[in-house]
Amino acid sequence: MNSCLNELQAMQLRRLLETGLPLAARPYQRLAEQIGSVEEHVLQQIQRWQEEGLFRRVGLVLKHRALGFRANAMLVMDIPDAQVDEIGRRLGQAAGVNLCYQRPRRLPQWPYNLFCMVHGREREQVCQLIERLLADNGLSEVPHQLLFSTRAFKQCGGRFAPPLREVVNG
């Protein structure tokens, strides 16, 4: 698929995507207007980048603390390797789980291989949700820990583009 955007427009689009999609009924049309193009060309370029492996998906970075969700915890579990994919899929679809992913264990210090992020307004709410999640999935006896956030770090989307001046100055 050939790009209908020129090199400068493509780089501008990458920069705009790093800051997030506009809150608009047609966010890709809004992006197109900002770079002097049309929505169809923006969508074609994004599809091309996805096919090339520049990124796997377009997702949402939720600033949960700004919305009042201050009790944020990571549930870490030691799931048998033969079950981790299936359990991870189930937990990733569960109400209240914002993110679920597998990582390698770092034995002997870190025996956990499945991670679930949960946000809540109050700590007790998160604890209850985790207890129910573990019980409903037969995981209450699985080695696990619930790690609450103590501070927030900067949240941002992916970074894909070099500084714009490198493209302009060539």
UniProtKB/Swiss-Prot annotation:
Pfam families, alphabetized: AsnC_trans_reg2, NirdL-like_HTH
E.C. number(s) listed in UniProt: 4.1.1.111
Disruption phenotype: Insertional mutagenesis results in the loss of respiratory nitrite reductase activity in vivo and in vitro. Mutant strains synthesize a periplasmic cytochrome cd1 that lacks heme d1.
Pathway involvement of the protein, from the record: Porphyrin-containing compound metabolism
Keyword annotations of the record: Lyase
UniProt cross-references to InterPro entries, sorted A to Z: AsnC_trans_reg2 (IPR040523), HTH-Siroheme_Decarb (IPR050684), NirdL-like_HTH (IPR053953)
Function: Involved in heme d1 biosynthesis. Catalyzes the decarboxylation of siroheme into didecarboxysiroheme.
Subunit structure: Probably forms a complex composed of NirD, NirL, NirG and NirH. All proteins are required for the total conversion of siroheme to didecarboxysiroheme.
Protein name in UniProt: Siroheme decarboxylase NirL subunit
